Amino acid sequence: MHDKSLKELCEQLSISIATGRNWVKLGKITPQYIKNGVPYFDKKHIAIIENEIRSGKNVALKSRRNKKYVSGNALYRSYVSQNCKNLTVLQKLLSEITREQILLTSDVISYFVADCALQLFGQKPLFFQYLQGKISIGKYDILLDALIGDRQRAMDFCQKYPAFFAHEYIWEPGEDILGLIYLSCKNMGSRKARGSYYTPTKVVKKLISHLDIEHIGKVLDPCCGTGNFLLQLPESVDLADIYGTDTDAVSIRIARLNMALKYPDADVEEICEHITEKNFLTEYDRTGFDTIIGNPPWGYAFSNEDKAVLKARYATASGRNTESYDVFIERALEILVPDGTLAFVLPEAVLNVKAHMRIRTILLQRSSVKSLTFLGD
């Protein structure tokens, strides 16, 4: 295991980068070294930090421990349909996590998601046996292994908490149960800092219902998360025409598993080529999309370095405050084909708040609005 940067440590602990920087500044955590201005932490020190948060031994980090147990284990019921059969099972899992006071690092959350994924591929609750190499899901092992990471570390956790992996999940087409586990376990504070809130399935379906599926062509979700928008596309849309990208590495690993479940005959290489971990605004270079869908992040806290890069590239980033969804719209319009379709879930403010004048001007200059639908709160 290589040393982790402050950003990677924050992702593992499910805290915002701002919180991590503040902890370093206040001396609550100490990096082993700093390279090119970036703090790095070794495996041993990360384990100490996790143990201190879990036990509450470090008073300075105790508030973080309490916040995580109180707000981090909420079942996000609205993410899936009301009839989702896995809700009861997941609620039991979350209750057990709360009772045992488990620190929900990104690794631990990944184990829960991987256990569920294994069952959706047709296996019973045999996660530990999978980790031992006794069972397989064939060509998709590589996708599951990417989510699990260090097998020995996962086995150690399974042996310590076997009850967590005794729950039985069932495959429900169109239900992103993998995303629901990830979302429900992930700390609310982390989602706020990243500007990302996962979209309820009923909202996703409503947006997709307005699309001309027969002419949807090549479709992209530039902020795909665990892939729910792509999962809700009709079966008639071929994987060859589906693309997604996101900056959250765990989300992308889950989205790839979701695509493997939706398209059981798909090649792993095609899934990985189409569902990528990239920054849509600065790294994603595919163009020529017929349809772009999704729910771009609202209120993302860009760093000063990010702002400088975006300001040099996008008109919507030239103001004092850069709103993430404005820049997403501008970039999406750039990579659409002529007469392509852009369908985003956006806040009402984009229509009438002065700060969004630039993107409204761009929309009027480069596109025509076909429909606006109020989705409610």
Predicted regions and their residues:
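Signature of N6-adenine DNA methyltransferases within the class I
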Residues: 3, 13-14, 28, 32-44, ...
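Mixed-charge intrinsically disordered linker/loop segments at interdomain junctions
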Residues: 22-25, 52
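Short, basic amphipathic alpha-helical segments that act as recognition/interaction helices
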Residues: 30, 48-52, 275
